[in-house]
Amino acid sequence: MINITLPDGKIVESDGPVSGEDVAKGISEGFARNCVAVEVDGKLTDLSTPIETDASVVFITTKDEQGLDIMRHSAAHVMAEAILNLYPDAKLTIGPVIEDGFYYDIDMPPISEDDFPKIEQEINKIIKAKKPFVRKTLSKAEALDFYKDNAFKTELISELEDGTISIYEQGGFTDLCRGPHVPNTGLVKTLKLMKVSGAYWRGDSERPMLQRLYGTAFFDKKELKSYLHLLEEAKKRDHRKLGTALDLFSFHEEAAGMPFFHARGMELWNALLAYWREEHKKAGYVETKTPIMLNKSLWERSGHWENYRENMYTSLIEDFDYAIKPMNCPGGMLLYKTKHHSYNDLPIRAGEIGLVHRHELSGVLSGLFRVRAFHQDDAHIFMTEEMIEDEILGVLQLVERMYSTFGLGFHLELSTRPEKTIGTDEQWEKATEGLRAALDKSGRDYKINEGDGAFYGPKIDIHIKDALGRTWQCGTIQLDMNLPERFDLTYVGADNQRHRPVMIHRVIYGSIERFLGILIEHYAGKFPLWLSPCQAVVLAMNDDVAGYAKEVKARLEEAGLRMEIDLRAESINKKVRDAQLSKIPLMLTVGGKEEAAQTLAVRTLDGKVKYGVTIDNFLDKVLPHIETRNPDLVEF
């Protein structure tokens, strides 16, 4: 007799081996139809896999995020089969699930979006056929023989440990895969091809160029329709287009992947950093600055020279190797070592807006989201073990304040100890419990990623959610046991002995360039008044009032507003239209009446106009709005 324990504690008995699918049908036929896979004693497997001993099961359904990932994995196989049906000489490589869909890298002649209709037609045939996904196992030798005509697959197989290797069949199509998969191709309800691009095999420019075919899939057509609508909205908000339209930044081939910020872009940049500095000063941080280029010996000590050199820009100066920093951390360690520290000095909270450079292949560069030169808002907190919980909680509270100012929601993920680590069991236990206790005290829900921490410490990843519901991983709170050891950091304890400090490395904006790109799309270029590059523009109706227009601009600039003026020989309607296209929050029209009365006609971005506003009344409304960083439009 086999006892199967369900999530609610109920036990289902079976006379012999039973599949997860049969157990699900025992609950109800309707429930079984919505099941995608099953966890048996924590191990994810196909519904068809026999359960041969007593076990606890958890069913993965179409309503679970994990269920969607499994179905998209199966969709990648469906797409791959369609490609081979249409292009028999194509060679499949890898096809992982990614955020919002999947892709498959294929060695084949170039294709374009013009080929998508016939590929999707073939895909739909495979879906309608409801072909079962069948898992089979081979020895390593058998797998190598099976794929002897596909050098990409044999390369992957050769790197696997000896033992059984799984493949999945759907009709006459077979692919190398760990699984699991949905029961049959019919559960891939809607599959749409999204785009195609070139990609080097394993990201190596010396290896063959492949066709990377992207797709997405959902359990019903409504979800697909909503997703496509979201993509259309995202296109309108594309920060690359808005960056040009709003005159914020540009890129030039003379410095690929390194943004040039224009005057308006720098106003936005400075407003963002002024807020960062204000909040960090209140939270007890000092601001530091370290050199952009440092000697090879530092990078050897930090481990970057050995592990990260291919991503670093290096130079030979007077027979010494130097590298432009890809990270701010090692410089922060040197700063700590410039003084002797007592336990009474701790915690030390030191932040840096540091410019870093990382070599990225030209093919992966993408606006402000993926660049070669960017600034990180790194901070290092040095403390005793007893301070971990309070310091983590302090960072979480700072994160809450700052993200909420931008109207960004977020969720937290705690990543715990992986298999290979440095540090003792006791250090890891104290560190992890400190992070966990701080998360519990914060009152926010969080997800645990078991074994997903770095080798040098557990971490908290912070994923923000923008106005379109997209998530972005920006902030990180990383407990680091590696660099304090490598740089021999110490403090003198109450016992008058030297001790190793605990160090937290954290970022909130992350890459500031990337964060700006996210904000541009989050706000669709319509920044709140406090953040807007230009907060108000004076629009002169004619040359006769140019003097008054300049006087208004000067008075408002003196009060601290970021101002522009439009004295062009254009109609007032064109000036208003241009200001609206530039998404300037406040448009101040001045003509003969306004000059005579010493007033303004104030137009807001929502099209409302208020006449007869004095400059003092204008400032009484606007300044508190800016000082409190109010996200709403000003009401006059």
Swiss-Prot record:
One of its GO terms (cellular component) is cytoplasm. Keywords: Aminoacyl-tRNA synthetase, ATP-binding, Cytoplasm, Ligase, Metal-binding, Nucleotide-binding, Protein biosynthesis, RNA-binding, tRNA-binding, Zinc. It comes from the Bacteria. Homodimer. It catalyses: tRNA(Thr) + L-threonine + ATP = L-threonyl-tRNA(Thr) + AMP + diphosphate + H(+). The gene is thrS. GO terms for molecular function: ATP binding; metal ion binding; threonine-tRNA ligase activity; tRNA binding. Its main location: cytoplasm. PANTHER family: THREONINE--TRNA LIGASE, CHLOROPLASTIC_MITOCHONDRIAL 2 (PTHR11451:SF44), THREONINE-TRNA LIGASE (PTHR11451). It is found in: Cytoplasm. Belongs to the class-II aminoacyl-tRNA synthetase family. Residues 1-61 form the TGS domain. The keyword tRNA-binding applies. The keyword Aminoacyl-tRNA synthetase applies. PROSITE patterns: AA_TRNA_LIGASE_II, TGS. This is Threonine--tRNA ligase. Zn(2+) binds at residues 329, 380, 505. Residues 238-528 are annotated as: Catalytic. One of its GO terms (biological process) is threonyl-tRNA aminoacylation. Binds 1 zinc ion per subunit. Its EC number is 6.1.1.3. It holds the Pfam family HGTP_anticodon. Catalyzes the attachment of threonine to tRNA(Thr) in a two-step reaction: L-threonine is first activated by ATP to form Thr-AMP and then transferred to the acceptor end of tRNA(Thr). Also edits incorrectly charged L-seryl-tRNA(Thr). Its cofactor is Zn(2+). It comes from Desulfatibacillum aliphaticivorans.
